[in-house]
């Protein structure tokens, strides 16, 4: 009897294994399912239209402007944190920190958020341009200050033209600068000359783009006295 039980158990195991094997044979690779979650706009178009109208009315009125800094990805967004459309509607300006590298989806979202009176600014960080030059110059001792001015001018022009190329609503100039107190005379003159060249190109751009927004972000006390009057050209 004991032996019969063993044989019966062995037969049962074989049958179960055979069923599992045959079911595995019929398995198919999983397929992704596109699930669409309707947006507020799709669920209630009229209510959304009323909301947009009231939002624009608020932003057209007198209020404290809200700026946010945004590290936009070089490729198309893969999650909500990389999307312009996910930023709060109360924001007025989004400053893109990677203005030279815009994906097609990010460009499309720049257009989409304008319906909420959210505008995008191309961020030009002068210190980054200086650092580019310093990295270039440290490997070549023969480069001169004239070469530095030429390089900085070319990079500045290349950054300014992005506003037209990508359809930004304006430019934010990020200029930290340095304290001029205690600077040696030759260093001071170089500092002033580079500053003057940079801002003169920005103001030339401004003359040709009166319909765009120009914002200065930095320390006013680090501007040379002869460059102070250019602040009137900013929004």
Task: Give, region by region, the residue ranges found by the protein language model.
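Bacterial Sec-dependent N-terminal signal peptides
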Residues: 1-7, 15-58
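Chitinase-like catalytic core of GlcNAc-active glycosidases
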Residues: 62-235
């Amino acid at each position: 009897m004991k032996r019969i039980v063993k044989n019966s158990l062995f037969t049962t195991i074989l049958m179960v294994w055979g069923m599992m094997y045959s079911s595995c044979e019929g398995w198919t690779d999983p397929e992704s399912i596109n699930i669409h979650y309707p947006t507020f706009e799709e669920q209630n178009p009229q209510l959304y239209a009323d909301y947009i109208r009231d939002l624009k009315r608020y932003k057209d009125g007198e209020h404290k402007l809200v700026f946010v800094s945004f590290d936009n990805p070089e490729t198309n967004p893969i999650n909500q944190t990389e999307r312009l459309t996910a930023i709060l509607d109360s924001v007025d300006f989004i400053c893109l920190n990677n203005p030279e590298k815009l994906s097609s989806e990010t460009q499309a979202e720049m257009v989409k958020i304008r319906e909420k009176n959210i505008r995008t600014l191309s961020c030009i960080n002068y210190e980054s341009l200086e650092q580019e030059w310093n990295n270039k110059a440290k490997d070549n001792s023969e480069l001169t200050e004239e070469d530095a001015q030429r390089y900085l001018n070319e990079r500045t022009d290349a950054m300014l033209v992005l506003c037209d190329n990508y359809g930004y609503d304006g430019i934010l100039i990020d200029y930290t600068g340095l304290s001029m107190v205690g600077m040696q005379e030759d260093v001071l003159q170089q500092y002033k000359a580079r500053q003057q060249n940079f801002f003169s190109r920005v103001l030339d751009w401004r003359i040709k783009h009166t319909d765009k927004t120009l914002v200065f972000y930095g320390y006013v006390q680090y501007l040379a006295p002869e460059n102070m009057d250019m602040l009137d050209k900013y929004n």
